[in-house]
């Protein structure tokens, strides 16, 4: 006996509803994307050897980055654009169970650059050679996930939001006609896509250029002026830090805002 149009429609919509429900559930339950890399360690047991570095953060203790930090290989460093980004890392027990501490992850901040070593092969000492994704981690962070005697371990990693206390900070270095601004304590993406500066003698924003790492520069003469910054993070969120730097500022000073990326 042939089905009625109404019965067919009810069956169709019931199947469609089940399909939609299954699709939504699958999407919601999808695990985060983990990528493969390797990790070594440096800097000593107290991570004192990780200070400074290719991002320009200087004293990582006073800047709030502590010992959970890492130098990134060329494939991850992105010419300094990755400075400040946060990564959750776990030892890959599927590839080296004997060298992994099970059930443990550590979240680190990118604070340095791990340069290539072209004198050594990529699989035997030249760990940071392109195109290898590699983390040279501060020793205390590395030992959270790996057995010390291994020296190098396979890892899985993923980008995660950076969690920070307080507002974005700006440190002004350089000299007249060369204003070098270090941006630190950046939440969410951790890294900056673009930055503009405006002095109190002007109403125009002037684009700044990434000089190295997390340092941005302007060649304008701004000494004695109140300064404002317009900062866009890697997600495209823009914050305006109006008059964050008073007119009596000096090179070497740090100014903490009340604004933070969310």
UniProtKB/Swiss-Prot annotation:
**Where is this chain's protein located in or outside the cell?**
Secreted, Cell wall; Membrane
Q: Where is the Expansin-like CBD domain?
A: 177-257
Q: Does the keyword Cell wall biogenesis/degradation apply?
A: yes
> What is its membrane topology?
Peripheral membrane protein
Q: Where is the signal peptide?
A: 1-20
Mind telling me which CDD domains this protein's record contains? DPBB_EXPA_N (cd22274)
Q: Which InterPro entries match?
A: Expan_Lol_pI, Expansin, Expansin/allergen_DPBB_dom, Expansin_CBD, Expansin_CBD_sf, RlpA-like_DPBB, RlpA-like_sf
Q: Which UniProt keywords apply?
A: Cell wall, Cell wall biogenesis/degradation, Glycoprotein, Membrane, Secreted, Signal
Q: A Gene Ontology biological process annotation? A: plant-type cell wall loosening
List all annotated glycosylation positions: 201
A family per Pfam: DPBB_1
Q: List, alphabetically, the GO terms of the cellular component aspect.
A: extracellular region; membrane
- Give yes or no: UniProt keyword Electron transport: no
Domain Expansin-like EG45 residues, every copy:
52-167
Q: Which family does it belong to?
A: Belongs to the expansin family. Expansin A subfamily.
Function, as annotated, reads:
May cause loosening and extension of plant cell walls by disrupting non-covalent bonding between cellulose microfibrils and matrix glucans. No enzymatic activity has been found. May be required for rapid internodal elongation in deepwater rice during submergence.
What name has this protein been given in UniProt? Answer: Expansin-A14
Natural source organism: Oryza sativa subsp. japonica
């Amino acid at each position: 006996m042939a089905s009625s149009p109404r019965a067919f429609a009810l069956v169709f919509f019931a199947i469609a509803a089940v399909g939609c429900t299954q699709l939504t559930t699958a999407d919601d339950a999808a695990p985060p994307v983990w990528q493969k890399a390797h990790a070594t360690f440096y800097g000593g047991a107290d991570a004192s050897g990780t200070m400074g570095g290719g991002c320009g953060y200087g004293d990582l203790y006073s800047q709030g980055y502590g010992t959970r930090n890492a130098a990134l290989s060329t494939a991850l460093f992105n010419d300094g654009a990755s400075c400040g980004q946060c990564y959750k890392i776990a030892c890959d027990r599927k590839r080296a169970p004997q060298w992994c501490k099970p059930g443990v992850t550590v979240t680190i901040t990118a604070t340095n650059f791990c340069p290539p070593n072209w004198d050594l092969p990529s699989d035997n000492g030249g760990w940071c050679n392109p195109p290898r994704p590699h983390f040279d981690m501060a020793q205390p962070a590395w030992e959270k996930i790996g057995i010390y005697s291994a020296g190098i371990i396979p890892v899985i990693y993923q980008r995660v939001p950076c969690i920070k206390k307080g507002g974005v900070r700006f440190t002004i270095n350089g000299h007249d006609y060369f204003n070098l601004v270090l941006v630190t304590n950046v939440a969410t993406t951790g890294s900056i896509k673009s930055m503009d500066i405006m002095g109190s003698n002007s109403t125009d924003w002037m684009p700044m250029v990434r000089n190295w790492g997390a340092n941005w520069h302007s060649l304008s003469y701004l000494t004695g002026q109140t300064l404002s910054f317009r900062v866009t993070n890697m997600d495209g969120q823009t914050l305006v830090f109006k008059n964050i730097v008073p007119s009596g500022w000096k090179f070497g000073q740090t100014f903490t805002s009340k604004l933070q990326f969310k």
